[in-house]
Regions:
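Rossmann-like NAD(P)H-binding beta-loop-alpha module
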Residues: 138-186
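FAD-site-proximal beta/loop scaffold in flavoenzymes
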Residues: 123-149, 246-314, 321
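A conserved FAD-binding loop/helix module that cradles the flavin
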Residues: 297-347
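Beta1-alpha1 glycine-rich phosphate/pyrophosphate-binding loop at the start
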Residues: 2-76, 166-201
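A Rossmann-like FAD-binding core segment of flavoenzymes
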Residues: 77-80, 84, 173-280
């Protein structure tokens, strides 16, 4: 009697899933029906997004087209949002279509900056994630600046980690190239960091170098300032800090601590205090072994790491391996993520700074060319 086929469902087109689907296409398992659910067809590669913002890459160069990737993996592609899990009946609840059954499900949907706790942020701030929303607002801003080159533009970024620093440097560099030198004085940039140090997770060399670079480029750095609210005042956004400091802005970009969608915790999966899925060393949910999770949406209980794209990329191959083992009723193998990792932070001007543990160097063009080569090589695997 032939074995019944099994249903493997991927929720989200994040880095880990893109890698796993690519590997699956090269060596598919028989009698497994694969489905990819994503609310977007084109998924961004986070490593190249600052370069895209800065104008070094086009849209196609920094996005993976999920439809042909799913086809290569012999998978069904469903363009829809997952809004819940029925774990008792093993079904994915979708926004616009009937539930999709699964025997095994993997979740890699990223995260969004936590804006809910700050009054007005959900209404007036532009979160760095979801990325398609960020890129829509960025494209609209570029059009407005080109249409009104003599107007004063005041832009703020909230969040002084690597993501916020790289974003504001990339935005400034792109807008500078867009405008004649005489009009650049109309651009005003502010970076807000709650702590008293920029890039607190990086070494002193990187912190000092980037703090100096922001100053050299005329970006106003506000350390020790907690943004307490955003309000609309006339045609501007009033950014208010707990200290009483206030700045009028035209756009506010939000690049702060990550948060998880509420449906994850509502589903009944074990989560950490922030609502991210708790997984073990095999990338399986601690409460439901038929559920795997990777990337920002997952927290490895024994090896907590920052919410960074490098970890999602590294989780791709072990996720593929363990999904195969689980589907074959074999024990999945543990995965231990690296404790230190190399970060290459772009300045928006064709230079980059390297940071790894206590090591730091740059900025220089050689590091940017190295970063560009690494990123292009990664994206080439999906062409």
């Amino acid at each position: 009697m032939p074995e019944l086929s099994q249903n493997l469902v991927f929720i989200g087109g994040g880095h880990s899933h893109a890698i796993a689907l690519n590997l699956w296409g090269k060596q598919p398992l028989a009698d497994v029906n694969v489905t990819l659910i994503s609310n977007v067809r084109h998924t961004p590669y986070s490593g190249m997004l600052p370069g895209y913002i800065a104008g070094f890459y086009c849209f196609e160069e920094v996005h993976i087209d999920l439809e042909p990737l799913a086809k290569f993996a012999r998978s069904r592609f469903v363009l829809d949002r997952a809004v819940g899990l029925d774990l008792d009946n093993r079904r994915v609840i979708c926004g616009d279509r009937p539930p999709i059954p699964f025997d095994v499900v993997s979740i890699d949907i990223g995260s969004t900056p936590a804006t809910i706790a700050t009054p007005g942020a959900a209404d007036y701030a532009i979160p760095a994630k979801p990325v398609p929303q960020l890129l829509h607002h960025w494209s609209e801003l570029l059009d407005r600046v080109q249409a009104e080159p003599n107007r004063r533009w005041r832009l703020a970024v909230v969040g002084g980690g690597a993501g916020g620093v790289e974003l504001i440097l990339s935005m400034q560099a792109r807008l500078w190239r867009l405008l004649p030198p005489g009009d650049r004085a109309a651009l005003e940039f502010h970076l807000f960091q709650r702590g008293c140090e920029l890039l607190p997770s990086h070494n002193p060399y990187v912190r000092t170098t980037l703090t100096r670079l922001l100053g050299d480029r005329g970006i106003h750095l506000h350390l020790g300032e907690t943004v307490s609210g955003l309000t609309r005042e006339g045609g501007a956004i009033a950014l208010q800090c707990a200290s009483g400091f206030c700045v009028a802005c035209d756009r506010v970009f939000w690049v702060t601590q990550a948060s998880a969608p509420e449906w994850i915790a509502r589903s009944g999966l074990a989560t950490d205090a922030a609502g991210f899925i708790l997984v073990g060393d095999t990338l399986q949910s601690l409460s439901h072994p038929e559920v795997f999770a990777t990337g920002d949406i997952a927290t490895m209980q024994n090896h907590p790491r920052p919410k960074a794209g490098v970890f999602a990329v590294r989780q791709g191959p072990p996720l593929d391996r363990n999904l195969r083992l689980f589907l074959q009723n074999r024990p999945p193998q543990p995965f231990r993520p690296q404790t230190q990792f190399l970060t290459l932070i772009g300045t928006g001007t064709g230079r980059a700074i390297a940071s790894r543990g206590a090591f730091g160097c740059g900025p220089n063009r050689l590091l940017w060319r190295w970063k560009d080569r690494i990123d292009r090589k990664f994206m080439q695997t999906f062409r």
